[in-house]
């Protein structure tokens, strides 16, 4: 009787468009498609290294609720548009770039003055619209990071972070935009009870879908290698206690789930502001929320499931220190 496990012999990559691909891997033993597919998906969404604007200083602006003469967008929308610019740094971890433009017209990411080791992936991305006499002068700090880091939980080591007019942004570093997977049936000779893993990956263009799945696989191998070696420098008794790491996805506001206005308002009325708050609630608790019915509950469950989450989960040390409500 064969006791060794099958390893995938076929890995095919099919391009579905720019920065979008389908990766097919087969065969797997039954059950391994879901085991590996879910693990890869979680790593792809939460652990990929990327680049994002983290701080912005706009001439003539003290805080994000200001407006600028001659600029169609208010500062809040201007910041949202700046967060949509996809940067890529080469051989450095941070850089400050400048955006200066005046006169009537459209301001795009291609108007940003870049250093030689900084690149904009989407130069046609619209940032603002200037009317006659309008002027925009912006300093943008771009940093390398991982996952999603809300501005209100970031830590700084010097007083310069408190400069009036400097606006700290929520930073979504992940270069992976969307990931989904399905498990289909596969066959090898007479065996028909095998799995075929099909992953659908879309990135921002900083890395290709193929490179994204390679990096996620390396991360998993690196993490699991500790268990394979069963060697450590600390015993359980000697190891200092460490606070559990919180998945960056849980620090995102519930607005990022893109729920209907009705569902989102019901959650906020119950002081559910972050995804980490939401997943700790049970179905029965949510159904007791005024104006939140079964239809809204099903919508919430479907959106959470698309991110590998469910209701009724337990979190340690929640909320983390510094998380605003």
Swiss-Prot record:
<dbReference type="Pfam" id="PF01193">
    <property type="entry name" value="RNA_pol_L"/>
</dbReference>
<dbReference type="GO" id="GO:0000428">
    <property type="term" value="C:DNA-directed RNA polymerase complex"/>
</dbReference>
<dbReference type="Pfam" id="PF01000">
    <property type="entry name" value="RNA_pol_A_bac"/>
</dbReference>
<dbReference type="Pfam" id="PF03118">
    <property type="entry name" value="RNA_pol_A_CTD"/>
</dbReference>
<dbReference type="InterPro" id="IPR011773">
    <property type="entry name" value="DNA-dir_RpoA"/>
</dbReference>
<dbReference type="InterPro" id="IPR011262">
    <property type="entry name" value="DNA-dir_RNA_pol_insert"/>
</dbReference>
<dbReference type="GO" id="GO:0003677">
    <property type="term" value="F:DNA binding"/>
</dbReference>
<comment type="subunit">
    <text>Homodimer. The RNAP catalytic core consists of 2 alpha, 1 beta, 1 beta' and 1 omega subunit. When a sigma factor is associated with the core the holoenzyme is formed, which can initiate transcription.</text>
</comment>
<dbReference type="InterPro" id="IPR011260">
    <property type="entry name" value="RNAP_asu_C"/>
</dbReference>
<comment type="function">
    <text>DNA-dependent RNA polymerase catalyzes the transcription of DNA into RNA using the four ribonucleoside triphosphates as substrates.</text>
</comment>
<dbReference type="InterPro" id="IPR011263">
    <property type="entry name" value="DNA-dir_RNA_pol_RpoA/D/Rpb3"/>
</dbReference>
<feature type="region of interest" description="Alpha C-terminal domain (alpha-CTD)">
    <location>
        <begin position="246"/>
        <end position="325"/>
    </location>
</feature>
<dbReference type="GO" id="GO:0003899">
    <property type="term" value="F:DNA-directed RNA polymerase activity"/>
</dbReference>
<keyword id="KW-0804">Transcription</keyword>
<dbReference type="GO" id="GO:0006351">
    <property type="term" value="P:DNA-templated transcription"/>
</dbReference>
<keyword id="KW-0240">DNA-directed RNA polymerase</keyword>
<keyword id="KW-0808">Transferase</keyword>
<comment type="similarity">
    <text>Belongs to the RNA polymerase alpha chain family.</text>
</comment>
<dbReference type="InterPro" id="IPR036603">
    <property type="entry name" value="RBP11-like"/>
</dbReference>
<keyword id="KW-0548">Nucleotidyltransferase</keyword>
<dbReference type="GO" id="GO:0005737">
    <property type="term" value="C:cytoplasm"/>
</dbReference>
<dbReference type="GO" id="GO:0046983">
    <property type="term" value="F:protein dimerization activity"/>
</dbReference>
<feature type="region of interest" description="Alpha N-terminal domain (alpha-NTD)">
    <location>
        <begin position="1"/>
        <end position="231"/>
    </location>
</feature>
<dbReference type="InterPro" id="IPR036643">
    <property type="entry name" value="RNApol_insert_sf"/>
</dbReference>
<protein>
    <recommendedName>
        <fullName>DNA-directed RNA polymerase subunit alpha</fullName>
        <ecNumber>2.7.7.6</ecNumber>
    </recommendedName>
</protein>
């Amino acid at each position: 009787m064969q006791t060794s496990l099958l390893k995938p012999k076929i890995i095919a990559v099919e391009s579905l468009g720019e920065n979008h691909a389908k990766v097919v891997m087969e065969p797997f033993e039954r059950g391994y498609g879901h085991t590996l597919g879910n693990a890869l998906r979680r790593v792809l969404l939460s652990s990929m290294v990327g680049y994002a604007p983290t701080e912005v200083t706009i001439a003539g602006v003290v805080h994000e609720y200001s407006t600028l003469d001659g600029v169609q967008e208010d500062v809040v929308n201007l910041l949202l548009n700046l967060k949509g610019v996809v940067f890529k740094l080469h051989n450095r971890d941070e850089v400050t770039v400048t955006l200066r433009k005046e006169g009537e017209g459209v301001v795009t990411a291609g108007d940003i003055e870049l250093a030689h080791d900084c690149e904009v992936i989407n130069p046609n991305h619209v940032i603002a619209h200037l009317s006659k006499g309008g002027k925009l002068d912006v300093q943008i700090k771009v940093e390398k990071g991982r996952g999603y880091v809300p501005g209100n939980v970031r830590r700084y080591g010097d007083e310069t972070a408190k400069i009036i007019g400097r606006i700290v942004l929520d930073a979504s570093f992940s270069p992976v935009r969307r990931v989904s997977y399905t498990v289909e049936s596969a066959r090898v000779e007479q065996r028909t009870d095998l799995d075929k893993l099909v992953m659908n990956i879309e990135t921002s263009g900083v890395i290709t879908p193929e490179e994204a799945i390679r990096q996620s696989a390396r991360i998993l191998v690196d993490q699991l290698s500790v268990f394979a070696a069963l060697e450590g420098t600390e015993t359980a008794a000697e190891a200092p206690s460490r606070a559990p790491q919180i998945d960056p996805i849980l620090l995102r506001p519930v607005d990022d789930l893109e729920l209907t206005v009705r569902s989102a308002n019901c959650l906020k009325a119950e002081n559910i502001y972050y995804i980490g708050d939401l997943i700790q609630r049970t179905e029965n608790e949510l159904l007791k929320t005024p104006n939140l019915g079964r239809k809204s509950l099903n919508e919430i469950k479907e959106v959470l499931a698309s991110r590998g989450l469910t209701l009724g989960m337990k979190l340690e040390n929640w909320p983390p220190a510094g998380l605003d409500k």
